[in-house]
């Protein structure tokens, strides 16, 4: 059986990276929420 998590740096950055978050309204809301919570890392 193939495992669900097949790590890839490129896919990780494209899907969850800062640029991907900034590209959509919802993504920007995610960043705002994470900033307000004082997260050390905003995105992948």
Swiss-Prot record:
MF terms from GO for this chain are: structural constituent of ribosome
Q: Which NCBIfam families match?
A: rpmH_bact
GO BP annotations, alphabetical order: translation
Kindly give the Pfam families that the UniProt entry links to this protein. Ribosomal_L34 (PF00468)
Reading the lineage from the top rank, the first entry is: Bacteria
Q: Which family does it belong to?
A: Belongs to the bacterial ribosomal protein bL34 family.
In Swiss-Prot or TrEMBL terms, this protein is called Large ribosomal subunit protein bL34
Which key words are in the record? Ribonucleoprotein, Ribosomal protein
List the InterPro entries hit by this protein, alphabetically: Ribosomal_bL34, Ribosomal_bL34_CS
Report the leader peptide range. Answer: none
Looking at the UniProt record for this protein, which Gene Ontology cellular component terms does it annotate, in alphabetical order? ribonucleoprotein complex; ribosome
